[in-house]
Amino acid sequence: DVFQTGRGRPWGEHHECCFCGTERFFRPAYAGHLLDEWIPAMEGVEDKLKKGAKVADIGCGLGTSSMLMAEQYPNSTIHAFDFHGPSIDEAKKRAAEKGLDNLEFFVSDASAIPNESYDLACIFDAWHDMGDPVGVAKSIKDTLADDGTFMVVEPMALDGLKNNIENNPSSSMFYGFGTLICVPASKAQPIGLGLGPQAGPKKLMGLLSEAGFSSVSLAAETTSNLVFQANK
């Protein structure tokens, strides 16, 4: 029915194993790269986090990225958001077990994040799942402090379909994920762009520029991910 109608399939309609399975899939990359490579590559960000910054983690799922940042930067306050209530419930349980008092979780759509003048807003492997990624980026821009940064982490992809298939070993896997999960999730939302997890850096940076950020750059890349920095 999803393929016949093009209406998509909402994220919340998947079996619950999809949610914990997605977290388990991405966890090794976050544990291995987020604190040691990705954040240090973001110009001006790590010093703020060490001193004490306000951070929004949007589309946080079960909260792995949120908890890693909360543990590493105890002087900072992390607000984590996801529109999927059951995932937020599980994230709260996991954070409570770790005793993280600088981390709060909220059920919220990505385009409805409160304006808290965040120093850093992040989306990890979820921007492409959103029906209106440009609209979300514009909304996030409005929640940032004047010198705030938007960090977008997306699955590794190369520009150009042929180039990506031939030279990116993970492309076939992510095209499969995108067909079954990511694109249908996006199509089930307003606008329904259907960006997919293999858009490539040129397309993604173009969307961030379209959202009105003053500067956009590819800050880091690892075998698993692309990391973009967009400054307000």
Stretches found by the model and what they are:
Residues 153-210, 217:
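C-terminal alpha-helical "lid/dimerization" subdomain adjacent to the S-adenosyl-L-methionine
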Residues 1-53:
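Conserved Class I S-adenosyl-L-methionine-dependent methyltransferase catalytic core
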Residues 211-232:
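Core SAM-dependent methyltransferase catalytic element
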Residues 54-56, 66-111:
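Class I SAM-dependent methyltransferase SAM/SAH-binding core
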